[in-house]
Amino acid sequence: MSITVFDPLTQVMILIFAFAFGAVFASFFTCMGGRIAQGRDWVKERSTCDSCGHVLGARDLVPIFSYLSTNGKCRYCGAKIPISCLVSEVLLGIYYVLCVLRFGISAEALRCMALSGLLLGLSIVDLEIYEIPDGFIIAGIVLWVITIPFVQTPWLTEVKQGLLGGLLIGGGMLVLSLIFDQISGKESLGGGDIKLFFMTGLFLKPACGLLSLILSCMVGLGFVLLLKKSKIPFGPAISIATCVTLLYGSYAVEWYLGLFL
């Protein structure tokens, strides 16, 4: 249901709530990703300052506002808090707003929001330890399965197109990586990246999955040039490309096909 059916004030309130939820989930998945990367229990452990170990209270855990109110420093020891925490909260908040504007109040919007949170979490882990835990991949697959009955696409079509997208993109990257591994004599693409391509392919379907693959390579190349490193974690690039394609990939595919039809 498009939010345009509501009056302007209600539309604004919906978008504000979407931004707030995005910021909250960004805080959660950023924390979870950081703890997993450090080998800590992300379920039972309480949030603490990484520098002084002080247990954080409720006022220290309000997304965006807690960071701004302390000028990006720990309230107890004055240690600097990475600005990446603030950036992730703002960006995911904006992304949630875009999801609502694109899909309205729908299962597609909720699916997109949930997947973007998972992608943020696994990107944090990949950036820290160059590894994508299988738990994120499994969670993504489960998310795809449980939302099939609620999206607008007929369930059988959703299953067929999703599996085809996952197998084509994930399987294709597996074959290509094996070929490059043989040629170069070293690993070109990690197993976690291939699994991630499969998982995101379930959501994107074949055409948008291919577009996401191209965007992933472009974003990855941008990271290489920007960071001036020969080796980078590819998970964040795949995640960024997936999030963009989820919102606007169908438009790009329709435009491209329209050039030939």
Task: Go through the PLM ranges and name each one.
Residues 1-11, 258-261:
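Short, strongly hydrophobic alpha-helical membrane anchors
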Residues 29-85:
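Membrane-proximal soluble regions of multi-pass membrane proteins
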